[in-house]
Amino acid sequence: MMSGVPPLKPSRSFLPQDSGPMLHRSPSGAKRKIRQKREEASRPSPFLSPSSSSSQTSISPTPTETSSNYRSLVDSGDYQSILPDFDPSFVPVPTPRLSVPFSASMSTLELSSSTLSSPVTAPAPPPPPTSKPTVEVHPMPTDERSPSMASSLNGSIDIDIYKPKPPVPIKPKGLRIDHLNR
């Protein structure tokens, strides 16, 4: 056949970008953001101490290597957290607050009620941290609302109910409607 021409290989796809030289495009917005995040992660943070920032500079930009470097830091004991030590047994309990300011009349009420009844016991301890919170379910109120309350809830609907409808105009005597030619 032809001796000077090499045999042609069939290409897998006939897309126009495969035919010519590769054009270098600017990265899309998502790729640009990913690149910026990688660059920011490789730069030391000004908020970290010098000892921890020196360990941060060795992070490589690929995600799999980043997670393996983190794991190796934790395993070797060189990882230093910037967060304070957390005691898992400590659970903050909010102190109860009075919604009404304390007055002398309330103190006499407390004294008189405590002398008549048994001694006041301490409030129930808070539930353990692993249990789910208690939810109180109340039935829906019946329709025994006052008209002012109802009108404030359903303003435009109630106004339409109380507004008198306009009278229907009287049909003119000479009006003829042909129902077949509509």
Swiss-Prot record:
Compositional bias annotation for Pro residues: 122-131
Stretches with biased composition (Low complexity): 43-68, 105-121
Region span, Disordered: 1-73, 105-182
Protein name as annotated: Uncharacterized protein B0353.1
Organism of origin: Caenorhabditis elegans
